[in-house]
């Protein structure tokens, strides 16, 4: 934990050694503390009700090392995991790779349901689907319900192999989430959690917490 205006590190050495280490040390500490501090604010780690937030920032990071180190710092700041699989390989299970499915993956298949089914057949224990590639209520939601029914039929005695969550990544996230929650409950699937992403920060997340999101993705 770092506090404002409180010395974090004191290094005593000769002048040449101090000059050589200064840039690297400051770069490392400043970058990691920047990301970890932002993650703490977003996750509410320092509050009584921390949020479940996944780090998705690698595509916007300033280079590969920043993407990996940023994922590590975000987890230190309270994020539950990262979309960066390389970061998990580098740092181990502490920096867990998590996430849903991409628009590009869904568009690769002949139909949205084909994409959902392929993902579920590959990762039956962690099915989290993106619903807004085409149309949330007219396409994404019906196909999600169809897939969950398929999993129930395929694994009748394994309640862990169900659709875990549904993600919205565009439009009015609050309004869309409210409609989706109502529709899922009406379909008898209250166990499917909501995930929101796209341009979120701590203020937007605070305004959306009324809509019962299980997770947020930021990056």
Q: What positions do the PLM features span?
A:
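Structural detector of well-ordered beta-strand residues that form the stable sheet scaffold
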Residues: 128-130, 195, 217
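Buried, small/hydrophobic-residue-enriched core segments of structured protein domains
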Residues: 2-191, 200-212
